[in-house]
């Protein structure tokens, strides 16, 4: 009588496939968690650099709080840091993904990507005006007198744009996870030629 190889049994194959899927999910979860923690650290760095950005000399005193764009940059970096930490904790939890959760990550990642991009863009414009000046709006070249202030502002803005890149990557990831896992089934009404896409959790 020919002996059956236990390793090739359907049950063993199923268990092996399940273990492999769990390993892949754990690896993916760890990678996404780290990807969400990186912008948190960057946001805190940009925030701290800008908060400490004050210079006083013979020409007077200048602080980040004197410029609305830089205040906005600080607030947005704080919000993004908090969201990054919260989302990293949620992703790190070993629980099955659901449709509402996938949609929440997708929408929040998209919104914060544009918010942090706007903060970086507006701050860049203000820093450019401080460096080059603009005679039409009587804006002098402040960086000539406050070089240290402008240098710290530049560092904070550069870090912020690195955060933008991280959030763009997160947006792509959350988009892929949502639309690859949850297809939109189409309901067709006979005789009317009407198709409606529906989602199920």
Curated annotation (Swiss-Prot):
Topology, Cytoplasmic side: 1-30, 94-101, 174-201
PANTHER family tied to this protein: CASP-LIKE PROTEIN 2A1, CASP-LIKE PROTEIN 4A4
Membrane topology: Multi-pass membrane protein
GO cellular component: plasma membrane
Quaternary data: Homodimer and heterodimers.
Pfam families, per database record: CASP_dom
Transmembrane segments: 31-51, 73-93, 102-122, 153-173
Major site of localization recorded for this protein: membrane
Lineage of origin: Eukaryota, Viridiplantae, Streptophyta, Embryophyta, Tracheophyta
Residue span of region Disordered: 1-27
InterPro entries tied to this protein: CASP/CASPL (IPR006459), CASP_dom (IPR006702)
Family named by the database record: Belongs to the Casparian strip membrane proteins (CASP) family.
Signal peptide: none
Descriptive protein name: CASP-like protein 2A1
Extracellular topological domain: 52-72, 123-152
Organism, scientific name: Populus trichocarpa
Keyword vocabulary terms for this entry: Cell membrane, Membrane, Transmembrane, Transmembrane helix
Subcellular location: Cell membrane
């Amino acid at each position: 009588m020919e002996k059956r190889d236990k390793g090739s049994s359907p049950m063993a194959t199923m268990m092996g496939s399940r273990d492999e899927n769990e390993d892949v999910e754990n690896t993916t979860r760890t990678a996404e968690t780290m990807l969400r923690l990186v912008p948190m650290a960057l946001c805190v760095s940009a925030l701290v650099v800008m908060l400490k950005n004050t210079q006083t000399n013979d020409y007077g005193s200048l602080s980040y709080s004197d410029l609305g764009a830089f205040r906005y940059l600080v607030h947005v970096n704080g919000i993004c840091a908090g969201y990054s930490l919260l989302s990293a904790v949620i992703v790190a939890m070993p629980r099955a993904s659901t449709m509402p959760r996938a949609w929440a990550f997708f929408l929040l990642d998209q919104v914060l990507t544009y918010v942090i991009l706007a903060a970086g863009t507006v701050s860049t414009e203000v820093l450019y005006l401080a460096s080059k000046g603009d005679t039409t709006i009587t804006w002098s070249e402040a960086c000539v007198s406050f070089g240290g202030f402008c240098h710290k502002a530049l560092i904070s803005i550069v870090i912020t744009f690195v955060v933008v890149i991280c959030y763009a990557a997160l947006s792509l990831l959350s988009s892929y996870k949502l639309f690859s896992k949850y297809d939109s089934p189409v309901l067709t009404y006979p005789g009317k030629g009407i198709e409606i896409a529906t989602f199920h959790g």
